[in-house]
């Protein structure tokens, strides 16, 4: 908090229930509702170039609402243990106060508003020396803001690119009005869903000195899902073979990290 920025605050209410169904599984369910105030978001059109204005002048304060319900089922039978978790959630932001308006004062989804989350985990112990594990996770994509439309400003000066021809005989030049991007609403785009499968096996053994050592062999993202790390706008240029005119269209491209990654780990306890 500063002299201009108030401390963030929140109130959360939750209620839950637990039930054990003998010889089948343990079940739990919990619902929550959370209100938040004095949240910070960058203003529409805020520029990050230069330091002519203080960061406090580039942000707005607003409120948020989040609510959801969580389910969990667990079971242990023999040497196998597993659980399944599912969460349905929603998180919105509202910036409608005078001087702090974002998105025309209309409600918009938070960046990490993920509607669905699923976690499935299982472990099996073959013996005191060997155990295996598997885990699968899924979540809906995060929200992001992109400008899908452009327009030419009426009052912007046109500039002319000199006429010229390249070595292939293509002609260039003409008037080009200044264009501006138009964002329909805040966080108007969703990343693709995130999911992956991880597998692992542990080999345990006691050393002659009585220390426990473990070899772990794991595979992260077994089926090499290309989950989005971030998405960016790319200008795609194509040429019409008949008119020999170039046309530029904006497309979205996805950058990914961490495809399938095998690993080996050695641990000794002493």
Please place each PLM-identified region on the residue numbering:
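Gram-negative outer-membrane beta-barrel transporters
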Residues: 32-35, 53-148
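Outer-membrane beta-barrel translocator domains and adjoining extracellular loop/strand segments
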Residues: 1, 40-48, 89, 94-103, ...
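Residues on the lipid-exposed face of transmembrane beta-strands in outer-membrane beta-barrel proteins
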Residues: 15-19, 69-75, 84, 120-124, ...
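C-terminal beta-signal and adjacent terminal beta-strands/loops
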Residues: 37, 129, 138-177, 192-196, ...
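Residues that define the transmembrane beta-barrel architecture of outer-membrane proteins
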Residues: 9-13, 63-67, 114-118, 193-197, ...
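Membrane-embedded beta-barrel scaffold of Gram-negative outer-membrane proteins
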Residues: 4-56, 65
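Extracytoplasmic loops and strand-loop junctions of Gram-negative outer membrane beta-barrel proteins
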Residues: 1-2, 11, 50-58, 67, ...
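Outer-membrane beta-barrel proteins
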Residues: 3-5, 17, 57-61, 70-72, ...
């Amino acid at each position: 908090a500063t002299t201009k920025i108030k401390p963030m605050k929140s109130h959360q209410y939750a209620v839950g229930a637990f039930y054990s169904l003998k010889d089948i599984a343990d079940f739990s369910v919990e619902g929550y509702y959370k209100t938040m105030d004095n949240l910070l978001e960058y203003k529409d059109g805020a520029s990050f170039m230069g330091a002519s204005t203080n960061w406090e002048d580039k942000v707005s304060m607003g409120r948020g609402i989040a609510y959801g319900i969580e389910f969990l089922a667990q079971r242990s039978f023999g040497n196998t243990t597993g659980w399944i978790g599912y969460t349905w959630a929603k998180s919105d932001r509202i910036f409608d106060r005078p001087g702090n308006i974002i998105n025309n004062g209309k409600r918009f989804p938070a960046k990490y508003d993920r509607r669905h989350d699923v976690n499935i985990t299982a472990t099996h112990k073959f013996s005191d020396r060997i155990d295996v594990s598997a885990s699968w996770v899924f979540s809906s994509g995060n929200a992001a803001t992109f400008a899908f439309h452009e327009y030419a400003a009426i009052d912007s000066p046109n500039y002319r690119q000199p006429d010229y021809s390249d070595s292939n005989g293509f002609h260039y030049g003409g008037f080009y009005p200044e264009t501006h991007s138009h964002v329909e609403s805040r966080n108007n785009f969703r990343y693709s869903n995130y999911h992956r499968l991880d597998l692992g096996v542990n080999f345990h053994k006691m050393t002659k000195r009585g220390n426990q050592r473990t070899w772990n062999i794991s595979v992260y993202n077994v089926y090499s899902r290309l989950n989005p790390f971030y998405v960016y706008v790319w200008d795609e240029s194509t040429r019409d073979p008949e008119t020999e005119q170039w046309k530029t269209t904006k497309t979205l491209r996805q950058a990914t990290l961490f495809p399938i990654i095998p690993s080996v780990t050695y641990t000794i306890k002493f």
